[in-house]
A protein has these predicted regions:
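Short, charged, surface-exposed hinge/linker loops at domain edges
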Residues: 1-8, 33, 37-73
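A short, exposed loop/beta-hairpin motif centered on an aromatic-Gly-Thr core
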Residues: 23-32
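Short aromatic-glycine-(Arg/Gly/Cys) micro-motifs in beta-strand/loop hairpins
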Residues: 8-22
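Compositionally biased, intrinsically disordered low-complexity regions
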Residues: 15-17, 31, 63
Length: 73
């Protein structure tokens, strides 16, 4: 079974941090591609190790990624 999840990747110093907000699972890498691949691996390990109750408890149904315009200064 496969599932589509959100991956948010942002630069952090010399590398990148990746986050899956639906499950609150994170990883990192030296490049965007590596951070994405490492997040995929972390998610696969989570699904292998977590009970169905843990998955249900942590899995949020809806995640919205959007931009917000704010006044600065």
């Amino acid at each position: 079974m496969t599932r589509s999840l959100t991956a948010i990747i942002e630069r952090d110093g010399d590398g990148y941090v990746s986050l899956c907000p639906e499950l609150d699972v994170a990883s990192q890498g030296d490049s965007v591609e590596q951070a994405r691949a490492n997040l995929r691996e972390a998610l696969e390990l989570f699904f292998e190790a977590a009970s169905s109750e843990e998955v249900s408890r942590r899995l949020s149904g809806e995640v919205f990624v959007t931009q917000v315009e704010v006044t600065c200064g």
